[in-house]
From Swiss-Prot:
Entry-linked SUPFAM superfamilies: P-loop containing nucleoside triphosphate hydrolases
Superkingdom assignment: Eukaryota
Protein name, UniProt field: ATP-dependent RNA helicase SUB2
Amino acid composition bias (Low complexity), ranges on this chain: 19-33
Enzyme class: hydrolase
Gene3D superfamilies: P-loop containing nucleotide triphosphate hydrolases
Positions with a binding annotation for ATP: 95-102
Region annotation (Disordered) ranges: 1-40
Organism (species): Debaryomyces hansenii (strain ATCC 36239 / CBS 767 / BCRC 21394 / JCM 1990 / NBRC 0083 / IGC 2968) (Yeast)
Length: 435
């Protein structure tokens, strides 16, 4: 496995299993309008429980940062996971996109962190550079009142010498490392990173990281270079029965949290439709949708980097200013485009599945499957970009082949959801736009 330029990123017991029932509640921080700067400051989680974050007895610095983000009450996942995770319990958590899984490990690791110059205490592994970048930003905003805490992100496609410079200097060596498997494995192999003080070992989107044999081997090598006594936490929106035992081999008596286990695709407020048409009709239909539908930001999923580039060029030439993000771009360009879209410089993004997992951009409220994914689980990750926790959203899938029809059937069967045909009269904006 290459240690640089990773494109698709990212032996040890019985467990306690908890199934958390799904609960819905009105949004505590309703989504803002497209041009409302307040959206950058306010969180989008819904208050599920009466319990507030203060009841977790978190550090005052963390509570202050949480307040600045606009979060008042923990989500159901946070309510169950945080009290156990801050005690050092191993955690395996599966919950739908947008339920605040990232905040669980960010807050719990910061709560337990006692920064020592030159010592890495927390290691977070994820499968793409964009997700690593996003997790680093989450650490930055929750540790804003903890000035001694340093976080760095390491991923392939950038000069490894920059990583080495940061790691060998005690003043710049981070306490928290967020990394993709290939680059991290390269640093471990070259003995350029010291993991002997790791207290928290986290894998986000763990199924994606551990399903591929070569990636799993890299993670196992990294894991063996950490202390035996440490906390291990793994999170994903989808955890098949087959991958769970693999995850648990890294853990000791983990607390297992399965929210809506193998169950309904009930992303609160998400409207889902399909449109049957010929392949050659897709471009015209897409133009019609972008013309007729109201949206803050839209993400359009395609199956390949070539199709992403071609569709992006077509949209721009048709007066739909868009941006394309995919694994075929040079590393710096890819990150810059991701940042540009997140900062609302463009309202339309054409992407491959590199944006299909974990990426959280609050203003996205429309997801279009120009090409349907090959697997039902990937559909969940894609449409989860719209209608993030506590907000409304709309998902439209273009169905043009027999294979597409089979995938659509699998999605409805897998998640016990009814995806209806897009109505001729269109969709009422009030059903998917936040007021």
């Amino acid at each position: 496995m290459s240690h640089e330029g990773q494109e698709e990123l990212l032996d040890y017991s019985d467990s306690e299993e908890i199934a958390v029932p799904t609960t819905t509640a009105p949004s505590a921080a309703a989504g803002e309008g497209a041009n409302d700067k307040e959206a950058d400051k306010k969180g989008s989680y819904v208050g599920i429980h009466a319990t507030g974050f203060r009841d977790f007895l978190l550090k005052p610095e963390l509570l202050r940062a949480i307040g600045d983000c606009g979060f008042e009450h923990p989500s159901e996942v946070q309510q169950v996971c945080i009290p156990q995770s801050i005690l050092g319990t191993d955690v395996l958590c599966q919950a739908k996109s947008g339920l605040g899984k990232t905040a669980v490990f960010v807050l719990s690791t910061l709560q337990q962190l006692d920064p020592v110059p030159g010592e890495i205490s927390t290691l977070v592994i994820c499968h793409t550079r964009e997700l690593a970048y996003q997790i680093r930003n989450e650490y930055a905003r929750f540790s804003k009142y903890m000035p001694d805490v340093k976080t760095e992100v390491f991923y392939g496609g950038t000069p490894i010498t920059r990583d080495l410079e940061k790691l060998k200097n005690k003043d710049t060596c981070p306490h928290i490392v967020v990394a993709t498997p290939g680059r991290l494995h390269a640093l471990v192999t070259e003995k350029s990173i010291r993991l002997n003080n790791i207290k928290s070992f986290v894998i986000d989107e763990c199924d994606k990281v551990l399903e591929a044999v070569d990636m799993r081997r890299d993670v196992q090598d990294i894991f063996r270079n950490t202390p035996h006594q440490k906390q291990v936490m793994m999170f994903s929106a989808t955890l098949s029965q087959e991958i769970r035992p693999v995850c648990k081999k890294f853990m000791q008596n983990p607390l297992e949290i399965y929210v809506d286990d193998e169950a309904k695709l009930t992303l609160h407020g998400l409207q889902q439709y399909y449109i049957k048409l010929d392949e050659k009709e897709k471009n015209r239909k897409l133009s019609d949708l972008l013309d007729s539908l109201e949206f803050n930001q839209v993400i359009i999923f395609v199956r390949s980097t070539q199709r992403a580039n071609e569709l992006n060029k077509l949209l721009c030439s048709s007066n739909f200013p868009s941006i394309a993000v995919h694994s075929g771009l040079p590393q710096e360009e890819r990150i810059e485009r991701y940042k540009s879209f997140k900062e609302f410089n463009k309202r339309i993004c054409v992407s491959t599945d590199v944006f299909g997992r974990g990426i959280d951009i609050e203003r996205i409220n429309l997801a279009i499957n120009y090409d349907l994914p090959n697997e039902a689980d990937q559909y969940l990750h894609r449409v989860g970009r719209a209608g993030r926790f506590g907000t409304k959203g709309l998902a439209v899938s273009l169905v043009s082949t027999k294979d597409d029809e089979e995938v659509l059937e699998k999605i409805q069967s897998r998640f016990d959801v009814k995806i209806t045909e897009f109505p001729e009269e269109g969709v009422d904006p009030s059903t998917y736009m936040n007021t």
